[in-house]
Amino acid sequence: MEKLMQQEELAMLAIWKTGSGSVKDFLENHPSPQPPYTTLASTIRNLEKKAYLTSRKTGNLYEYTPAIAEEEYK
């Protein structure tokens, strides 16, 4: 399993805390300082490419779900 960069790891912590949701949901649970929305959205897309997340489109909203458990990563 590929080691995550610090920014990606912080995003995954927010995602694991939230469970599943949109970028906006993850931004609310992101540790301070919170990144700009667009930065977090790009990070989430990268995490999806690395197979850490799965996504499902509902209307014009993407819902992301962790593909691996936090314990599995650590």
What feature does the model see in each segment?
Residues 20-30:
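Short acidic, hydrophobic short linear motifs in intrinsically disordered regions
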Residues 4-7, 58-74:
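Short, cationic-aromatic polyanion-contact patches
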Residues 41-45:
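Short, hydrophobic-biased segments on the C-terminal half of alpha helices
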Residues 55:
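Short beta-strand "wing" residues that participate in macromolecule-binding interfaces
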Residues 15-19, 68:
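Short helix-capping/hinge SLiMs at alpha-helix to coil transitions
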Residues 9-14:
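Pre-recognition alpha-helix immediately N-terminal to the DNA-recognition helix
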Residues 51:
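Glycine-centered, phosphate/nucleic-acid-interacting loop/turn motifs that mediate DNA/RNA or nucleotide
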